[in-house]
Design a protein with these regions (language model features):
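C-terminal scaffold of the Radical SAM
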Residues: 1-251, 309
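Minor-groove-contacting beta-hairpin "wing" of winged helix-turn-helix DNA-binding domains
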Residues: 277-281
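Short, amphipathic alpha-helical interaction segments positioned at domain boundaries
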Residues: 283-310
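Intrinsically disordered or highly flexible coil/loop and linker segments, enriched in small
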Residues: 208, 234-235, 271, 301-304
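The C-terminal cap of the DNA-recognition helix in HTH/winged-HTH DNA-binding domains
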Residues: 13, 231, 261, 267-268
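A short, conserved structural fragment
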Residues: 264-276
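Short amphipathic alpha-helical interaction segments
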Residues: 248-266
């Protein structure tokens, strides 16, 4: 919203090879409702300049915002497709006013019903499929020759706070900036959300971490299983056990492995459930968050603490 041509030239001079532009929506009415400024420069102009530099471009959108309709979001996706981004992401708006108080303001503007929100995603997915994009994981769409598509075909897809990436280039994520979250193998750490404090600490050479969470061994196991399900729509218990150097039973013990509940999902056509593995069906892939949540011990009796899957 604030960058002019000079700013973009400075970024290009840094040698970045991929840019992700957080658009949210092209509809000015929607942007005003969520107190978001439109881009200072036409997004088409920015994308073209970044392409000229040899960089790849991702466009990120959010569906489920106040003021959005299936038709308006379809127009936004159509405009994005015309730019032919290398990747396009459709994030579901997470309404968690019990965590972010300011979100209560958006309730006054009226949030789309859940059924309409789901239709926004389905319509976008249909548009992108017709345009030749491949659906990756929960929310990414990529060109057929993209590294993510190749990783998915090899069941080597990985996901972190930045989105999806091939497992072969997976590394720990170190956060820079206010409120950024570092994702480490054994812990998570979040930087302060206070801008003044962040500037003060960095100028003094101090860490800006405000809070953290150390993962217990079983949580690290559960994270691997859920990540595999969300990335590759598939978990083989023996393969997972070998990767983690534990038994298949120990893998299941780290989960909320509720056979009757999982069997109900299988009966509904969302998953295939076998003694050797669990896999999402094509019909079940849009509901991968729901399946993952059913396996997560942290979600038991805590559904209201987290954003809704759709």
């Amino acid at each position: 919203a604030y960058l002019n041509d000079e700013h973009w030239e400075q970024l290009i001079g840094c040698g970045f090879t991929r840019y992700s532009l957080g658009i949210q929506d092209f509809d000015d009415n929607v942007l005003r409702t969520v107190n978001r400024r439109p881009s200072l420069l036409p997004v088409e102009h920015i994308v073209e300049r970044l392409r000229q530099s040899g960089a790849k471009v991702n466009l990120d959108f959010i569906y489920g915002l106040p003021g959005q309709t299936v038709q308006s979001f379809a127009r936004t996706i159509a405009r994005a497709i015309d730019m032919r981004p290398n990747r396009l992401v459709t994030f579901s708006y997470a309404h968690v006013p019990y965590i972010y108080n300011r979100q209560r303001i958006l309730e006054k503007a009226g949030l789309p019903p859940e059924a309409e929100k789901m239709r926004m995603f389905e319509q976008a997915a249909e548009q992108l499929a017709r345009a030749g994009y491949c659906h990756i994981g929960m929310d990414h769409f990529v060109e057929p020759n993209d590294d993510l598509q190749q990783a998915l075909e090899r069941k080597q897809l990985h996901r972190n706070f930045q989105g999806y990436c091939p497992r072969r280039i997976t590394a720990q994520v170190y956060a820079l900036g206010v409120s950024g979250i570092s994702q480490l193998d054994v812990a998570y750490a979040q930087n302060t959300k206070d801008v003044a404090r962040y500037i003060q600490h960095t100028s003094e050479g101090r860490l800006c971490i405000e809070r953290g969470y150390a993962l217990q061994p079983w949580q690290r196991v559960a994270r691997e299983v859920i990540e595999s399900l969300m990335c590759n729509y598939y978990v083989a218990w023996t393969d997972m056990a070998e990767r983690l150097n534990i038994s298949a039973e120990e893998v299941k013990e780290a989960l909320n492995y509720d056979v009757p509940a999982l069997q109900q999902m299988a009966d509904d056509g969302l998953i295939t459930l076998e003694p050797t593995h669990i896999a999402l069906t094509e019909a079940g892939s849009p509901f991968v968050r729901n399946v993952a949540a059913a396996l997560d011990k942290m979600m038991i009796n805590n559904n209201n603490r987290f954003s809704k899957p759709v």
